[in-house]
Amino acid sequence: MREPLAGTQTLIEAKGVSFAYGRQPVLEDVDLEVRAGEFVALVGPNGSGKSTLLRVLLGSLDPSSGTVRLFGEPPSRFADRARIGYVPQRPVLDSEVPATVEEIVTTGRLARRGWWRPLHRDDHEQVGHALDSVGLGDLASQPLNELSGGQQQRAFIARAFAGEPDLLVLDEPIAGVDAESQRRFRDSITHLIEEHGAGVLLVSHELSAVASDLDRVVVLKRRVVFDGPPAELAASGVSLGVHPEDLPLWLEELR
């Protein structure tokens, strides 16, 4: 088992980040930081720039201005990508690849351990735990391309869990899943943070399952309009830019 990360270590950091598609600004002067052991939620209305910000933070897009650091390095220089587990909202799957769910999840473990190192008993156990954490243990031997879109996304979440990343970045990972799957998801997040000191950045509209575990909530509307503990958001009067009846249940519960 590897040593937990130091709680003061900054895993991902953005300073003064702006981004535009052509002349259309999407992000404006965004500051964001996630440290080891932190569980941070990124929320905001549709079109607020959340998914774009994730892509900028991870180096898929270059900011128009400002700086980004992954583990202290510019994304273009950060080579140890196995330290990061990233699950986009809509993972891209090659339908011609006949891999099973378990095989796909195992690649997450291999990426972290080293592709040419044999897997040991604890590695296979971690893959099994990851599958169970997203409710796919019974479907481990099924071809991934035969699963529904939601099940495929859960398989990629399990792949990220199997690698026990130092930084976990998730874009809408629990939309539409049942309460039991949400509980398992929460337990896996808690394990990563408590046992390994991992940092977690979560984009989601459905945070009721994890609201009590969050350290910070960041509200994005092209720029950061709030960054602080969930309870302070409920008292701050910051609007998420949606109709009151559409406010997430977790926010209502904090009032």
Spell out what each predicted region is:
Residues 121-139:
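Conserved ABC ATPase "signature" region
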Residues 66-80:
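Conserved ABC transporter NBD signature motif
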Residues 168-172:
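Catalytic Walker B motif of ABC-type/P-loop ATPase nucleotide-binding domains
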Residues 58:
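Helix-to-loop junction immediately C-terminal to a conserved catalytic motif
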